[in-house]
Amino acid sequence: MIFNCKVKKVEASDSHIYKVFIKPDKCFDFKAGQYVIVYLNGKNLPFSIANCPTCNELLELHVGGSVKESAIEAISHFINAFIYQKEFTIDAPHGDAWLRDESQSPLLLIAGGTGLSYINSILSCCISKQLSQPIYLYWGVNNCNLLYADQQLKTLAAQYRNINYIPVVENLNTDWQGKIGNVIDAVIEDFSDLSDFDIYVCGPFGMSRTAKDILISQKKANIGKMYSDAFSYT
């Protein structure tokens, strides 16, 4: 469905990630893990909805974390739309990699960069629905300065006994005490058998496809219990 939107709030972080809160002209239902398509200067740009479906008056999008022209252009577009209160168009909701909240299986959530927005929606929904099974969240970034939601996730892990948060930094450039390297390698190191897990993945396209291939071949992951919109493309 097509909606006209306005930007109601923009939150910047030290890591150059922007949380953009947009308000559609009509509320619509979506599932945790779905995304919107923003029409921007003749381009169709997908953004995961970062908030829980129970909070649908404003949609939270995470923008940035990349020097790619599309990311810079999107940030500029949203900031200008906020300053001048210009309307823009989205198409929503989209995506089949939504949370299967009826499942009792443990959850493995894997995010790369701003792929955390997708994972954040799923995690927030798990908390809202009081799901009690173990939840493991692995978040991989290039350097620790890009962990823009690190404290928020640490707080949730401390508050809920079933949530385990594991940040992974690929390039060490400071006094980092956590895991170092590729986020998929970190998962491989920590698990021997993923056959019972529901696995949700979001990040760069190559990372998502690599996660699928490696976790199935090396860790017995069940393809029927793995979810990522990247899996829809060959």
Swiss-Prot record:
InterPro entries documented for this protein: FNR_nucleotide-bd (IPR039261), MRET (IPR050415), OxRdtase_FAD/NAD-bd (IPR001433), Riboflavin_synthase-like_b-brl (IPR017938)
Keyword match Oxidoreductase: yes
SUPFAM superfamilies linked to this entry: Ferredoxin reductase-like, C-terminal NADP-linked domain, Riboflavin synthase domain-like
Biological process annotations from GO: bioluminescence
Documented EC number(s): 1.-.-.-
Top EC class of this enzyme: oxidoreductase
Superkingdom of source: Bacteria
MF term (GO), any: oxidoreductase activity
Its biological purpose: Probable flavin reductase in the luminescent systems of different marine bacteria.
Protein name per its UniProtKB record: Probable flavin reductase
Organism: Photobacterium leiognathi
Gene name of the encoded protein: luxG
